[in-house]
From Swiss-Prot:
NCBIfam families: cobQ, PRK00784.1. The active site is at C333, H430. Catalyzes amidations at positions B, D, E, and G on adenosylcobyrinic A,C-diamide. NH(2) groups are provided by glutamine, and one molecule of ATP is hydrogenolyzed for each amidation. HAMAP family: CobQ (MF_00028). The keyword 4Fe-4S does not apply. Pathway: Cofactor biosynthesis; adenosylcobalamin biosynthesis. InterPro entries: Class_I_gatase-like (IPR029062), CobQ/CobB/MinD/ParA_Nub-bd_dom (IPR002586), CobQ_GATase1 (IPR033949), CobQ_N (IPR047045), CobQ_synth (IPR004459), GATase_3 (IPR011698), P-loop_NTPase (IPR027417). GO terms for biological process: cobalamin biosynthetic process. One of its GO terms (molecular function) is catalytic activity. Residues 251-438 form the GATase cobBQ-type domain. Belongs to the CobB/CobQ family. CobQ subfamily. Keywords: Cobalamin biosynthesis, Glutamine amidotransferase. This is Cobyric acid synthase.
Amino acid sequence: MTRKIMLQGTGSDVGKSVLVAGLCRLASNRGLSVKPFKPQNMSNNAAVSDDGGEIGRAQWLQALAARVPSSVHMNPVLLKPQSDVGSQVVVQGRVAGQARGKEYQALKPGLLGSVMESFELVSAGADLVIVEGAGSPAEINLRAGDIANMGFATRAGVPVVLVGDIDRGGVIASLVGTHAILSDEDRRMVTGYLINKFRGDVTLFDDGIASIRTFTGWPCFGVVPWLKSAGRLPAEDSVVLERLARGGGKALKVAVPVLSRIANFDDLDPLAAEPDVEIVFVRPGTPLPDDAALVVIPGSKSTIADLEDFRRQGWDRDLDRHIRRGGRVIGICGGYQMLGTRVIDPLGIEGGKREIEGLGLLSVETEMAPEKTVRNSRAWSREYGVLLEGYEIHLGRTAGIDCGRAPVEIDGRRDGAMSADGRVMGTYLHGLFGSDPYRAELLRSFGIEGGGGNYRQSVDAALDEIAAELDAVLDRVWLETLLG
């Protein structure tokens, strides 16, 4: 019989995704067939699953941790926030439409069938399924029709473990408050809790555990330390960009403008892992740094709206100065579209303006189209003559003179564009920096010897380290019961 557990947070960004990934790897290391599941995710960091649809990147990573192929059924409902039209709704890997907040609330009861169907498919043949909630079950204003937290848990009969983040402060109040606000039915689903992101001597929290037990009756299943290895994993949400270290004094500075609807910014993680590379995420209201050698414009869920914001920030002028100083630019997906001379949206797919002038750094134009490209890809760098692996998730077709200097060949077809002087390039291929040979050649073009490490092996090793830490700190009785 398949064992099931669900981690729900007392709030967003408490570390549920990493804990699920770590538990998946721990179970896999014990020889179990384990699978992750998240009923509903909201993220513009999407991945292409092994069965060819869109899922949250966190669930893709959790499948990697579990050593199983990723599937659209591991994240049956994915919400991708965009501009005035609200969020794009992806159901079982395919775009099902767009919805604003109230519209989506009305849709949720109808989505529960898809969620339960996917959960049954994921559970089939597994020893253990580890489910991740979204946000907090204490948001009782959203409880009616809920499919992400207690609504799912009660329907599927999955016991819940709450996760509280002690690093942000107020963890006792958040757990006790969640207990107080839950209905009797929902409260009965909770079997205990985990304290996450603890720094220092855990015995200093013994009185805290006793207090929580007094107010709630819930046992503590473990106090998890700050997991340093998690810093080597792809980040799920753009909220982490607020606190990423900027470092200094590195050989190569790479500036990344943080777009309002930034997507798939984990493209930068392999570069950030290089010891001689400093990634500077440039927040709105801050100019692009003068001393950056490379500017990377990342993906966007709403190219036209983000291009308007780009200009409002004055980044277009900063980029022109960067080019005049001899700097280089790489645009990925939506960033590639922005680099052209024009972006048109005749069908209003993005929900805003129908046409906008591009940054004019590539002689190409993009037309948005309803057909969405979603696929994993093997590619060839025509620029450096090395193999690439990545994925495509985009709307729109791009064409123009500079496409004749396409820097990438994907499955036999040319992709992207490059300026005549070779200093500006764009591509639809996500993940190119994660290809070790490409990253090495890119760094070499800046006079840096790097890219010698295997990024994917580094991620895999980090998962093993997290699993080992969880094995050491979690309550033995609870853990052995979970893992059988």
